[in-house]
Amino acid sequence: CFLIMAIGCVVLLRHTNIINKFNWLFFLSLGMATSYFDFLTYPLVTLGIPLILYLQLETSSPSQRFFQITTCSLSWGIGYIGFWAEKWLLGSVILQENLFSEAYNSIILRSSHETLGQTITYMATLKNNLQAYDLRTWKILWLLLFLVTIVLALHRHCLTLHNILAFSPLCLVACMPFVWYYFTQNHSYIHFGFTHRELSITFFALSCFLVQLCNSSHIEPKQKI
């Protein structure tokens, strides 16, 4: 997943103008590549990190960014799920077995709220994935980043409702891992050693949000939200 995400970011930076015209195809390809190479470790980073970078390179209005988030996410999802379905179809034809029923049972298991006969809660899933960052160093760094951002934003008179709403699409992307954990509770609870890395989307999105907030003097007040 890391290599797919990194390659996607490099392609995005080198061919920004082309991807702006065919963003749906770019994220569709990322979803397909993730489905082919990944073993269900932390696939969401191949959507979240490039999407944040794409939003950073865009100069569109917040409403347009929300639309871009929706279309790019749907494109990635179609590529990811569609390629999985294609593998099941080819496997069923070659092996002369109904792999779709096996895939369906696997999906039900991985999205269930139980493991080894015990009920899994959403909070327990979050706790497992957040414990990797339960270090004093991480907490101090985030607290310092937050305080420095607030001080700079106040000093530059950037901490306004308009500016906060202007960069709110990044906050939407930051919520993606938590939605993923909700729909894959069994998998995220058991394999938190992999899935906790999807929180890098949240950290990157919030970091970009704070930096943009401090550097938001270029935003015109008449920009539509």
What are these regions (language model features)?
Residues I190-C214:
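Hydrophobic/aromatic-rich transmembrane helices and adjacent perimembrane loops
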Residues F2-N17, F27-G31, I49-L57:
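Specific aromatic-rich, kink-prone transmembrane helix
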Residues C1-I7, L25, L40-L47, R197-L206:
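Membrane-embedded alpha-helical segments of multi-pass membrane proteins
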Residues A85-V93, L154-C158, V179-H191:
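Juxtamembrane "helix-exit" motif on the non-cytosolic side of transmembrane helices
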Residues L13-F22, L55-F67, H155-L161, L210-I225:
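Membrane-interface junctions at the ends of membrane-embedded or membrane-associated helices
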Residues I69-T149:
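Membrane-lumen/periplasm interface segments of specific transmembrane helices
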Residues W24-V45, P50, I69-G82:
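Membrane-interface alpha helices of multi-pass inner-membrane proteins
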Residues I150-A174:
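Membrane-interface helix-loop-helix junctions at transmembrane boundaries of multi-pass membrane enzymes
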